[in-house]
Design a protein with these regions (language model features):
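N-terminal secretory signal peptides that target proteins for export/translocation
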Residues: 1-6
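Bacterial N-terminal signal peptides
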Residues: 11-20
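Beta-sheet-dominated interaction scaffolds and their linkers
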Residues: 26-51, 151-160
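Asparagine-centered strand-capping/turn motif at beta-strand->loop junctions
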Residues: 52-56, 168-176
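Short beta-strand and strand-turn-strand segments in soluble, beta-rich domains
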Residues: 62-64, 68-83, 178-189
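Intrinsically disordered, low-complexity Pro/Gly/Ser/Thr-rich segments with frequent PxxP/GP/PP motifs
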Residues: 75-104, 187-211
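Terminal connector regions
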Residues: 102-154, 159, 211-233
Length: 233
């Protein structure tokens, strides 16, 4: 599912609209898309890569990429090459991402975000203000240490749920970030939520919920939904 945020950027003779989305080759008939909706950087890997594709038949894009921390700051712990380049029409390129920072926690995943901004070129200067649309795709980047007790595939079933009056608490006792999708409490749909390793999240009991039972799916390393599970107490 895409989450898009828009904000206006005003320059001389230019009003730019910056769109921030997550996508997998989601460029439609003309634009820039990414080859993944999330990345996993396993400890010990020299680098990982992310494909970028320009599906426009005639518009080149300037591509700029960087890695961010969860508090929306640029991370100095990663290098992306090339950090800035022109992606010609109907063309693809690979971004290579390398971790150069200090050792991270060994008992859990760490979360970062990969940001790819695409600015279309303009070949003619029009009179007055022109509208220029840039896209900024932001996807999760998980740094995963070696030697975790079990693989990600076993983690979703380990979630535990507790009823608390008008709340339901979902606990994640695993070393993985787990994104809950198709989440229902008492048969009522609840907004998707990511729960950090060894953390918990309290959901208000939805209006009209028949009980506090919880069903959910999660997102795997490939961005696909896993089979539905019933949360155990």
């Amino acid at each position: 599912m895409k989450t898009c945020i828009t904000k206006g950027i005003v320059t001389v003779s230019l009003t730019a609209i910056l769109l921030s989305c997550s996508s997998t080759w989601a460029a439609g008939k003309g634009g820039v898309g990414l080859a993944a909706t999330r990345l996993v950087y396993s400890e010990g890997e020299e680098q990982i890569s992310l494909g970028v594709r320009n599906t426009s038949p005639d518009v080149p894009y300037l591509i700029q990429s960087w890695v961010m921390t969860p508090d929306n700051k640029k991370s100095a712990d990663f290098i992306i090459t090339p950090p800035l380049f022109v992606l010609n029409p109907a063309n693809e390129n690979l971004l290579r991402i390398m971790y150069i920072g200090a050792p991270l926690a060994k008992d859990r995943e760490n979360l970062f975000f990969t940001s790819v901004r695409a600015v279309p070129s303009t070949t003619k200067r029009k009179e007055g203000n022109t509208l220029k649309i840039a896209t900024q795709s932001v996807i999760k980047l998980f740094w995963r240490p070696k030697g975790l007790a079990y693989p990600l595939g076993e983690a979703p079933a380990k979630l535990r749920c507790t009823s608390l009056a008008d709340m339901v608490m979902v606990s994640n006792p695993t070393p993985y970030f787990i994104t809950l999708t198709d989440l229902k409490i008492g048969g009522k749909v609840v907004k998707n939520q990511m729960i950090s390793p060894f953390d918990k999240y309290q959901f208000p009991l939805p209006k009209g919920a028949q009980n506090s039972s919880v069903t959910y799916r999660t997102i795997n390393d490939y961005g696909a939904e896993t089979p539905q599970l019933n949360c155990k107490s």
